[in-house]
């Protein structure tokens, strides 16, 4: 049954001065709130390796943020902002980034009322010869509200990934209330980012340095990666009074066969780095159920966890995914998920969560509340009273699931 949750019950007072507008000089110098067995304490993030018990499994999201925000101008001078969401032709990320000369993307279009037809040209306010030679143009193929299908074309034989590097800016969150700057190119990206495709960083990972990860490994924790490309929906507020009226956007994810086997075999407590890793890991059960019942894994729907009781164990669901890949000689599961995690969710894989402090009345606050119960209020009250910095560039927390 879809939970009837009033989003107003998950609000807290966050003033502008508590939002971190810029990262700290050192990634691992942020504060770390630790919640365990109902107790809340304050540490420093670089102490995380000594806090984590050994013998566990830590899962990161190794997606990479792309400079997906582009500014074009009509011949009339009207500025059109185009925010690339996901590739359409070619539909695979790797092929789309390698495309030369032309490609199509699903985009959010700013000032779309002013763009009915005809090509628009990339703005070049500083007269860059590189931008001039590239001659990047965009045509709106079809429109659906604020989103649309946009065809990009350019010269010079460059791959589209290079086009974005030259022409695009990092799409930092709107609540920072500033334009992206050179510091964001490095710091709004995890040190282990690998696969291009996100329009928002998995911000829990921003605190990790290679040294931190190395120390965690040395403490006996296995390190593994999933990849979920974070979509623009991560910035969308919940506008409906009840969470049942909120629509989650599809986000593509992938996970290696070896990690599926590790999760199935168990014996290690799982620490997820960030809510995107959580949503990927907890989607696996429902993909496995689809595999058991239909013979193949389907994208995970928003309300799959709440629609009915499932008779299968987590091991059975993971087994089904493993067999599906093995039968096809494949080593990576690639799917999409719209899963929403709210109070009442049945946890199957994740035991601990590293996460930042999220916006009031957001789906991410609901995920935290599902993880720690009503203690989410104590956690946030503590963070507010002790001067923690909030949101993407803010401080972090290590939460142990309430069992």
Language-model-detected regions and their locations in the chain:
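Surface-exposed, charge/polar-rich loops and edge strands
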Residues: 1-403
């Amino acid at each position: 049954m879809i939970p009837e949750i009033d989003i107003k019950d998950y609000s807290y007072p966050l003033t502008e001065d508590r939002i971190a507008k810029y990262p700290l000089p050192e990634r691992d110098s942020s504060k770390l709130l630790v919640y365990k067995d109902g107790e809340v304490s304050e540490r420093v993030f670089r102490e995380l390796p000594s806090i984590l018990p050994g013998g566990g499994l830590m899962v990161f999201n190794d997606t990479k943020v792309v400079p997906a925000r582009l500014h074009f101008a009509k011949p009339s001078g009207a500025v059109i902002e185009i925010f690339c969401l996901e590739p359409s032709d070619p539909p695979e990320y790797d092929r789309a980034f390698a495309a030369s000369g032309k490609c199509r993307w699903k985009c959010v279009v700013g000032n779309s009322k002013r763009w009915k037809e005809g090509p628009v040209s990339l703005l070049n306010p500083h007269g860059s010869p590189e931008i001039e030679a590239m001659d990047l143009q965009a045509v709106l193929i079809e429109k659906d509200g604020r989103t649309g299908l946009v065809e990009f074309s350019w010269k010079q034989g460059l791959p589209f990934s290079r086009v974005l590097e030259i022409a695009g800016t990092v799409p930092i969150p709107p609540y920072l209330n500033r334009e992206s700057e050179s510091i964001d190119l490095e710091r709004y990206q995890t040190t282990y980012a690998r696969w291009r495709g996100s329009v928002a960083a998995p911000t829990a990972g921003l605190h990790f340095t290679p040294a931190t990860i190395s120390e965690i490994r040395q403490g006996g924790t296995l390190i593994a990666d999933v990849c979920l490309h974070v979509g623009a929906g991560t910035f969308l507020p919940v506008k409906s009074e009840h969470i049942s009226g909120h629509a989650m956007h599809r986000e593509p994810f992938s996970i290696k066969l070896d990690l599926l086997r590790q999760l199935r075999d168990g014996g290690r407590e799982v620490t997820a780095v960030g809510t995107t890793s959580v949503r990927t890991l907890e989607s696996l059960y429902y993909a496995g159920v689809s595999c058991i019942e239909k013979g193949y894994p389907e994208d995970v729907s928003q309300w799959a966890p709440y629609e009915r009781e499932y008779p299968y164990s987590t091991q059975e669901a993971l087994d089904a995914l493993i067999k599906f890949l093995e039968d096809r000689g494949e080593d990576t599961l690639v799917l999409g998920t719209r899963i929403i995690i709210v109070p009442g969710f049945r946890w199957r894989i994740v035991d601990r969560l590293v996460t930042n402090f999220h916006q009031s009345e957001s789906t991410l606050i609901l995920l935290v509340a599902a993880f720690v119960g009503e203690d989410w209020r104590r956690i946030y009250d503590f963070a507010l009273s002790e001067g923690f910095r909030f949101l993407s560039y803010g401080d972090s927390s290590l939460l142990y699931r309430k069992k």
